[in-house]
UniProtKB/Swiss-Prot annotation:
GO MF terms, alphabetically ordered: GTP binding; GTPase activity; metal ion binding; structural constituent of cytoskeleton
Domain of life of the native organism: Eukaryota
Binding of Mg(2+), residues: E69
Matches recorded under SMART domains: Tubulin, Tubulin_C
InterPro entries: Beta-tubulin_BS (IPR013838), Beta_tubulin (IPR002453), Tub_FtsZ_C (IPR008280), Tubulin (IPR000217), Tubulin/FtsZ-like_C (IPR037103), Tubulin/FtsZ_2-layer-sand-dom (IPR018316), Tubulin/FtsZ_GTPase_sf (IPR036525), Tubulin_C (IPR023123)
Binding-site positions, GTP: Q11, E69, S138, G142, T143, G144, N204, N226
One GO BP annotation of this record: microtubule-based process
Keyword Nucleotide-binding (UniProt): yes
Protein name: Tubulin beta chain
Protein species of origin: Onchocerca gibsoni
Amino acid sequence: MREIVHIQAGQCGNQIGSKFWEVISDEHGIDPLGQYHGDSDLQLERINVYYNEVQKKRYVPRAILVDLEPGTMDSVRAGAFGQLFRPDNYVFGQSGAGNNWAKGHYTEGAELVDSVLDVIRKEAEACDCLQGFQFTHSLGGGTGSGMGTLLISKIREEYPDRIMTTFSVVPSPKVSDTVVEPYNATLSVHQLVENTDETFCIDNEALYDICFRTLKLTTPTYGDLNHLVSATMSGVTTCLRFPGQLNADLRKLAVNMVPFPRLHFFMPGFAPLTSRSNQQYRAVTVAELTQQLFDAKNMMAACDPRHGRYLTAAAIFRGRMSMKDVDEQMLNIQNKNSAYFVDWIPNNVKTAVCDIPPRDLKMAATFIGNSTAIQELFKRVSEQFTAMFRRKAFLHWYTGEGMDEMEFTEAESNMNDLVSEYQQYQDASADDELNETIEQAETE
């Protein structure tokens, strides 16, 4: 079976990671102690993708929980599903990274990294045929960003041919925890560009907007935000966990979604968006789902797809529905919005359908877009980075851990290159190549 090893690092990573396990355990009929109480064989058919079976019918998540301080781990362990995880797979330090990327990447994190790799190795060796790794973390803090990217590069060294997927929470100006977020995020993106195959950019600002505007929650908590993230993660991984009419695994997803290796930052979306309380009352049609999916308000990254063009996109529908309906609606939306899809990748929207809907919904859909508009997000972080870096503000926290200013300069220019690459493909059209060929022919 194609197994996935899940790693969650830092406070944010552990919070969204734990929520993800709650959601999928529920979908697979697994209680907080790992016992199966489901009602359908489909729940167990591909359970090994995410769980190890220990004794008869007891399932343990193939998850590794990492942090540089014990606090978050303690609350996970005390939470509803705390007894589900394997006790040896909690790996934590005592010192904390203090929201400092350098501590996570070079000093504190580097000391803990070998014990984490031992656990990862152990999980990977127990796999029948390891498909890849999925990582949940934030880019704004110290552990998830600094130590997270360190782990990713180490795993990359050891398993170069396995897919590396990350769910990365990008800092946003409206929802800020620390003033040095732009530094941490830029240094992280510098790593992610080189070392991951697919990165789902989740943005707190977008999540807040969804809670506020669409779900009409007046004071959204992190719990509400994490609820949205887990719905999306559950949707993205549906195809891996359940049999369906059109299936995807991490590698197929990467092949369809990534036209150029550096441009693998996706914006996820989810439909129908309903708040936790009034989920059960809404009937949805395939047409409505498709409409909602491509709506800018539904994107989990705070950038507007109408400001760019889609290089590629994928939609994953869940529930009992006719494939014909789905195909018609997807074609329809592409024809209506053809200006927003690049014309030099024909058929750049892929669809998958899985028969099993999420709890309390008859139908749902998840959207993954590789849009050039994601550059807005990088631009935003980059501007904040430059503003501080010009004055060398807060740099001593990083140089004190042995970092060099050069590294900041490199990270900054790598981020700017990424933005220009997106811009270049946004402006490119199929006719350009044609015109160039004609011009060359004329000059010759």
